[in-house]
């Protein structure tokens, strides 16, 4: 299957993401805040993945919709997220929280596009100077080299 890039996105892609996010939102478990959220993303291989928020009486363990989306991404074969949409119960765009921006970043195509309340934005715009696997490797790789030099 050919790879989809953000430059290939059409209005039809965004409409499909919005509809899937709305459908996912209907499955949200939000008995405490009653703030239901659905998220959907297009994967570089053409798949669509989605998730909904799942609240918990211990608010700190509540799962955002993006958590479910990334779990589905991994469960269905992984890949890179090309486009992302998140909606509330009224169908309005929701911005991912900081934790979810980092979570999405881990699985994002380099030029992933997100539908934000203020318009379309790249992953670098919503999470500038993001922490990536390259940051980990830079430190771990340097520590490995130092350990080897000391032996």
Where are these regions (language model features)?
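C-terminal binding/interaction regions
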Residues: 2-9, 13-24, 76-151
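Compact, glycine-rich, soluble single-domain proteins
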Residues: 53-67
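Short Gly/Pro-enriched turn/cap motifs at secondary-structure boundaries
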Residues: 29-32
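Short beta-strand scaffold segments in enzyme catalytic cores
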Residues: 34-43
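Short, well-ordered amphipathic alpha-helical segments that serve as non-catalytic structural scaffolds
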Residues: 20-23, 65-73
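Histidine- and/or cysteine-centered catalytic micro-motif in compact active-site loops
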Residues: 42-44, 53-54
